[in-house]
UniProtKB/Swiss-Prot annotation:
Transmembrane stretches, start-end: 10-30
Family indicated by similarity: Belongs to the KdpC family.
Biased composition (Low complexity): 70-82
Record organism: Rhodopseudomonas palustris (strain BisB5)
Protein name: Potassium-transporting ATPase KdpC subunit
Name of the gene encoding the protein in the UniProt record: kdpC
Molecular-function GO term, any one: P-type potassium transmembrane transporter activity
Localization annotation: Cell inner membrane
Region described as Disordered: 67-105
Sorted UniProt keywords: ATP-binding, Cell inner membrane, Cell membrane, Ion transport, Membrane, Nucleotide-binding, Potassium, Potassium transport, Transmembrane, Transmembrane helix, Transport
Nucleotide-binding in keyword set: yes
Principal location class: membrane
């Protein structure tokens, strides 16, 4: 019987070493050499401290900052571990919403967000990504339209000209990859850092 089991055990050990140890270490090493920033998590450092990642969104509530997409991520309720509470941009629990298009709770939330945004900028159409969560709940980017929609509020809150803030948005807008893939986008954290740097000058 041992004769029959031995080849299977040898294959198990060999594949475990190759797939579970050698391959991950090799890929991590290669990534660290070829793409050091991305391999380390695309971390953004300010004044020697890590303040975020270019790959994970953050919640900004202050009027003087651009806001990202809504996030449907949650966390365990400290008062009752069998329940969850809203925890926007919780990278430990990446998820979208389970609410479907016929959900009253979802429709009420979207309507409330639209009304709030309309009050902020009555003359413009509300971009869809400002009222809909992404599938991961961690999207760090918004469309240029969503950023431009927020320009009047941010300019007002900071005492800046709308034209100057608009130019900053345009400067932070990334185009399609190779001119073909994806959509133009703006990283919210990078935009807010650029805004802070401009305001300090």
């Amino acid at each position: 019987m041992l004769k029959e089991i031995r080849p299977a055990l040898v294959v198990l050990v060999v594949l475990t070493v190759i797939c579970g140890l050698a391959y991950p270490l090799a890929m991590t090493g290669i990534a660290g050499v070829l793409f050091p920033e991305q391999a380390a998590g695309s971390l953004i450092v300010k004044d020697g401290a890590v303040i975020g990642s270019a790959l994970i969104g953050q919640e900004f509530k202050d009027d003087k900052y651009f806001h990202g997409r809504p996030s449907a991520t949650s966390a365990a309720d400290p008062a009752d571990p069998t329940k969850t509470v809203s925890s926007p941009y919780n990278a430990a629990n990446s998820s979208g919403s389970n609410l479907g298009p016929t959900s009253k709770a979802l429709n009420d939330r979207v309507k409330e967000d639209v009304d709030k945004l309309k009050a902020e900028n009555p003359s413009a159409a509300v971009p869809v990504d400002l009222v809909t969560a992404s599938g991961s709940g961690l999207d760090p980017e918004i469309s240029p339209e969503a950023a431009l929609f927020q320009v009047p509020r941010v300019a007002r809150a900071r005492g800046l000209s709308e034209d100057g803030v608009r130019k900053l948005v345009n400067a932070q807008t990334k185009g399609r990859f190779a001119g073909l893939l994806g959509e133009p986008r703006v990283n919210v954290l990078a935009l807010n850092l650029a805004l802070d740097a401009t305001t300090r000058k």
